[in-house]
């Protein structure tokens, strides 16, 4: 709220089947939304559900959009990167328009103890950072008005860590 212009563009990092891209597209003021994912299978699924949508198969952090956007959204993806904090700098410099924002949701972080065995049990790399390290990473990348909060907490689950930052 209050971080986007009345008309805005958006991209979802690690878009999977494109659910967030479709939801963004329906938001008042969204004039363009797209998604990128490293899984060709997931991009094909997104395209089959939403043939009119803009979905890109690309490996992050190397891939980047042709033009920057007002909103970069990422749910459950950034911790798969080797160095997500450096990627925040790339987002700030190359992906986000001045006045635009990033909104990130992560379930795998140090304080969420039930997520700490995911890397081993799924046999995939996951970068484990504390909530404070995630938040400080956004600040160090140059984002301002950085906020973080937890949502969906319940017994044995600390909730999703949500981070928001705005580019001046």
Label each residue range with its predicted role.
Residues 11-62:
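Class I SAM-dependent methyltransferase SAM/SAH-binding core
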Residues 107-125:
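Short, glycine-/aromatic-enriched active-site segment of Class I SAM-dependent methyltransferases
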């Amino acid at each position: 709220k209050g971080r986007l212009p009345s008309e805005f563009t958006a991209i979802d990092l690690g878009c999977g089947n494109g659910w967030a891209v479709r939801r963004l597209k329906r938001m008042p003021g969204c004039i363009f939304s797209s998604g990128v994912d490293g899984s060709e299978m997931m991009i094909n699924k997104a395209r089959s559900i939403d043939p009119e949508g803009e979905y890109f198969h690309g490996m992050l952090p190397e891939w980047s959009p042709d033009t920057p956007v007002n909103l970069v959204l990422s749910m459950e993806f950034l911790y798969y990167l080797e160095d997500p904090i450096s990627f925040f700098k790339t987002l700030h410099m190359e992906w986000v328009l001045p006045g635009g924002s990033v909104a990130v949701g992560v379930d795998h972080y140090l304080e969420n103890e039930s997520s700490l065995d995911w890397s081993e049990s799924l046999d995939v790399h996951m970068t484990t950072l504390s909530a404070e390290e995630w938040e400080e990473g956004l600040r160090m990348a140059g984002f301002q008005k950085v906020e973080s909060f937890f949502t969906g907490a319940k017994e044995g689950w600390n909730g999703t860590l949500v981070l928001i930052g705005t580019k001046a």
